[in-house]
Regions:
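Nucleotide donor/acceptor-binding cores
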Residues: 3
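Helix-adjacent hinge/juxtasegments
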Residues: 50-87
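A short beta-strand-loop structural module common to alpha/beta enzyme folds
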Residues: 30-42
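C-terminal binding/interaction regions
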Residues: 6-15, 91-155
């Protein structure tokens, strides 16, 4: 379980921060919506760099990162020491990221293109909330997974 989670977004995920905050509020998880100056472009690498400072300072122990696909945020977060970020578009993927990899960050893509259909796919507010709630309430399994996480930490 997390003590405090930072919710951040680039320009494409900005409108969904309140959806995530509401999901956390419903299950009594403390959160912060940090302010940061990443310039007019609000590029996701700058957002990740900014929120990582809060994590390093111990002010938060979890991150929820929102952007168009979620992929850029995930890549950026996984470059930060101590962060294990799962990209999830279903509650099951979010849960497995916690159970197997002890992920402390969740990247969500709020809208992206489906390569099969070519149509823009958006996660519903309800689905975002379910993914978030599943992520923060799922425990790490430990055991053999702890050994694997330690190996990841030492890469």
């Amino acid at each position: 379980m997390f003590n405090k989670i930072a919710i951040v977004a680039d320009h494409r995920g900005e409108d969904f921060k309140i959806v995530v905050a509401d999901a956390l509020k419903k299950i009594n998880i403390d959160y912060v919506l940090p302010t940061y100056d990443t310039g007019a472009e609000n590029d996701y690498p700058d957002v990740v760099k900014s929120v990582y400072k809060l994590y390093k300072q111990g002010k938060v122990d979890g991150l929820i990162l929102l952007c168009g696909t979620g992929v850029g945020m995930m890549i950026g977060a996984n470059k930060c020491k101590g962060i294990r970020c799962v990209w999830a578009n279903t509650p099951d993927v979010a849960a497995l990221g916690r159970i197997h990899e002890d992920c402390n960050a969740l990247a969500l893509g709020v809208n992206y293109l489906d390569n099969n259909s070519g149509y823009k796919v958006s996660l519903s507010k309800q689905k975002i909330q379910k993914i978030v709630q599943t992520f923060v309430t799922t425990a790490f399994a430990g055991g053999r997974h702890a050994r694997r996480v330690e190996k990841l930490n030492n890469l």
